[in-house]
Design a protein with these regions (language model features):
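Feature activates predominantly on carbohydrate-active enzymes
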Residues: 1-142, 146-160, 178, 182, ...
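Acidic, contiguous N-terminal accessory segments
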Residues: 1-26, 153, 190-197, 201-205, ...
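Hydrophobic faces of well-ordered beta-strands that scaffold small-molecule active sites
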Residues: 31-35, 62-64, 115-119, 161-163, ...
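Active-site beta-loop-alpha junctions enriched in small/polar residues
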Residues: 33, 38, 67-71, 120-124, ...
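Active-site neighborhood of glycoside hydrolase catalytic domains
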Residues: 130-206, 211-215
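Flexible, acidic glycine-rich loops studded with aromatic residues
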Residues: 203, 211-351
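Predominantly extracellular/luminal regions of secreted and cell-surface proteins
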Residues: 352-361
Length: 408
């Protein structure tokens, strides 16, 4: 249906389709994005707008990270104290009603998008602990959590419930197996972060890889989100690698590799939701992921390439130029008046020289300041220079040594 909508043309008050034959299918079955509303509340109107816009590019999953240390953002009628302002440490009193959640599920379905609600457990749960004065892994905590899962499963007419399980010390070995079984008995499939609880095939329905340490397991479908975080506050930090990299280093999805979800983690507080979109360069990054997850293929993986462009005499560079031109067209015509800070970078060229030794003297000058050359002779040693393309020039990427810098 999204392909048909993409082909639809409008003339005056009429809509029409051109006569054509299309052979097209997705390389990966999951192509999504995640919002961390547990840390920072985002209005329902903004969420719907983003889902609507991105669904036009065949993004088919919205991952809704609803709970965090800072707040429990989903209304509970059985435990309304969870939503009390005094139990939220950021944006107190802001949460989504159960009816709003149901409406968003219906909104997503109309756009062929699957909503995945996440209730993070047993970690990232300080709001829960503050409310009930007990850990989720305690007997009391599990009793409360099961009642909350009854409410969540009844509210969300969706196939999956995400239970987190990341970044936590497990003190109750029965907690995760018992919660997975309980939610499955409600007719839901269960997703869990990896690294997190260790599962064998059949013990979980899907994992989501959040760290470079995350590994897909045979018999358990995996979502690759390992380097798909975009909260780096630099519009050029991620896009080239997102576009070029193969998803989990695979050309196509299979039984064990389901696809990818790009994540905005609101660790830093931004009160303006448009600022969240702009500073994370959401739309441009999502178009890169949308194309790669639909078409498949790519070149290498994030950890073996920089965020710079390939040389301009390569087919990879030519493909990115084509993508960039189409993306900038959509910036003007589809995302009109939306925060879309990306600008053309295929015309950005640098000449980078090897480092000259200043021996701590910041006032010292060197030959490149006077003349641009391919190499320089300085105090009997030759220093080379090279041409680099693109705006993602890093001495050290925000991922640290996991991603090569421009000299890598």
């Amino acid at each position: 249906m999204q392909t048909i909508q993409q082909l639809t043309c409008k003339s005056n008050e009429y809509h029409f389709l051109p006569t054509c034959e299309i052979i097209d299918w997705p390389a990966f079955r999951i192509r999504g994005f995640m919002h961390d509303v547990g840390r920072t509340y985002i209005s329902m109107a903004e969420l719907k707008k983003e889902i609507d816009l991105l669904s036009k590019f065949k993004i088919n999953v919205f991952h809704w990270h609803l709970t965090e240390n800072q707040a429990w953002r989903l209304e509970s009628k059985i435990y309304p104290e969870l939503n009390a302002p005094e139990n939220m440490s950021r944006m107190p009193g802001k949460y989504y009603t159960l009816q709003e959640a149901k409406d968003l599920v219906a909104f997503c379905k109309q756009r062929h998008v699957t909503l995945i609600p996440e209730i993070d457990m047993p970690g990232h749960s300080e709001a829960f602990v503050k409310t009930f004065q007990t850990d989720m892994q305690s007997e009391k905590g599990m009793t409360i959590l099961k009642q909350l899962m009854d409410e969540v499963c009844e509210t969300f007419d969706t196939p999956y419930i995400h239970i987190g399980t990341d970044e936590v010390q497990f003190i109750n070995p029965q907690f995760v197996p018992e919660m997975v079984t309980y939610i499955r008995q409600k007719g839901k499939k269960v997703i869990s972060w990896n690294p997190g609880w260790q599962y064998q095939a059949g013990e979980i329905d899907m994992t989501q890889l959040w760290s470079y340490r995350g590994k897909a397991q045979s018999g358990i479908p995996a979502i690759d989100s390992r380097y798909h975080y975009i909260n780096h506050f630099d519009i050029f930090a991620d896009l080239v690698a997102l576009y070029n990299s193969r998803i989990y280093n695979q050309d196509m999805g299979n039984e064990d590799i389901a696809g990818s979800i790009l994540a905005i983690w609101n660790d830093r507080y931004l009160s303006d939701e448009k600022q969240i979109v702009a500073e994370n360069n959401l739309y441009a990054n999502m178009l890169a992921l949308a194309e790669r997850s639909w078409k498949g293929g790519g070149y290498g993986y994030f950890d073996d390439q920089t965020n710079l462009l390939w040389k301009n005499d390569t087919g990879i560079y030519t493909q990115f130029v084509d993508f960039e031109n189409r993306m900038l067209w959509h910036k003007e015509h589809t995302f009109t008046n939306e925060p879309f800070p990306y600008v053309k970078q295929t015309n950005v060229v640098w000449r980078i020289t090897e480092a000259f030794p200043n021996e701590g003297d910041l006032t010292r000058s060197f030959p490149p300041e006077k003349e641009e050359k391919e190499s320089y002779l300085y105090k009997g040693k030759t220093y080379q220079s090279r041409i680099i393309y693109g705006a993602g020039l890093y001495l050290r990427h925000v991922w640290g040594d996991l991603i090569p810098g421009f000299a890598g």
